[in-house]
Amino acid sequence: MQNYKVSIAYDGASFYGFQKQKSRPTVQGKIEEVLDLLIKDYELNYSGRTDAGVHAKEQVLNILTDIKITEKLISSIDKLLGSSISVNSFNQISNDFHARYSAKERTYVYSTMDNQKKLPYLLNSTHQHNSSLDLEKLNEISQLFLGKNDFSSFAKVEKNKNPEREIFKSVWKKNSNIFTYTITGNSFLRNMVRNLVGVQLAFNDNKLTLKEIKSQLDKPDGNRLNYIAPANGLTLWKVKY
């Protein structure tokens, strides 16, 4: 079999998440529908699942198949995927490459705007926050998450799964009234990025204190800080190998 690395982008507003579901449109479901038609016999892997409404600038797949994947075939795949999914690039790669298990870093970007001015044309990709945002305050809290930590208070942790993750970058930037949060880590727990964004927005709004947040990082007590930011502001930005 030959192994192909494929980078795709998608508009999450069109899907109920990445992972295949019965009778609901998902990114994986659409991809498999097209591959079943054009390739038939294959194994599909992906770098990670995204929730309903979450977008991707670069989601990475690997496809193991006996069929030779050419530019022409990729063009046909891209066309059949429709307007909400696009193939960025593809290349043949060694058979030991796995889109998920070979990944070293993943970067997500969260986009939000404060309540000073509504921009309706951005609502599918940018969260409209209901209060003013303070860049200095947001970056004060974002630095807490750097390094290795137990994030069990900031995510939905599956049974017997190690809740420790390492964060390499955690920073907010502002352009006009658009605030973007960039986070890079070795991997993320379920809902972790949206939960971290939600906690930071709650801190911005004085609903949580620095002490409360830090205590759950230093000594998680099983009580999740359940502040989940809306999915529409989140984009899987890049996967590094």
Positions of the model-derived regions?
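Structured-RNA-binding interfaces characteristic of tRNA pseudouridine synthases
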Residues: 1-241
